[in-house]
Amino acid sequence: MLEKPLIIFKAIILFFFFISFSYAELLSPNSTISPKEVIKIQLSGLQQNDLEYKDSGIEQTWKFAHPNNKRVTGPLSNFKMMIKSDSYGMMINHLSHTITELGSSDKWAQFEVIILDKDKIYHKFNWQVEKYTSEGTLKDCWLTTMVSSPIPLGSSI
């Protein structure tokens, strides 16, 4: 008699357990995330853009954009259009990426990023992050301030 309610209870617990993992929240900036990790988070999101939900990778990238960068690109809807444009569309669902530090200080870091897009073409970017120094929730967080236009490097085949 007690078996059936216990099985139902276990099924409900498992259901909510799996739901909580299938809709994981996006990562937010915090002062413990290194400059290179910021770029890894952004690129991993773009590599699996629709993993959590449609455009979750673009939204993840947006969360780590510097406020000055956000003022230039406009609201998230504009940022999504920019990332999906011909200029940056190769970042969406790319196959792989490498991140190489070019230089850094205690306030900025510059990286070379090479992406292999889904058409197996390599693209190089310069990616810069800066430490946010103003007061508020972003203080001392590393945030993206600049991503260059891509430089095509040719096919992997």
PLM region spans:
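Bacterial N-terminal signal peptides that target proteins for export
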Residues: 2-12
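Bacterial N-terminal signal peptides
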Residues: 10-20
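Boundary at the C-terminal end of the N-terminal hydrophobic targeting segment
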Residues: 22-26
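Alpha-helical scaffold domains
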Residues: 29-30
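Short, aromatic-enriched amphipathic alpha-helices that serve as compact interaction elements
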Residues: 34-50, 64
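Short solvent-exposed beta->alpha transition segments
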Residues: 52-106
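Exposed beta-sheet edge and beta->alpha loop/turn motif
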Residues: 101-157
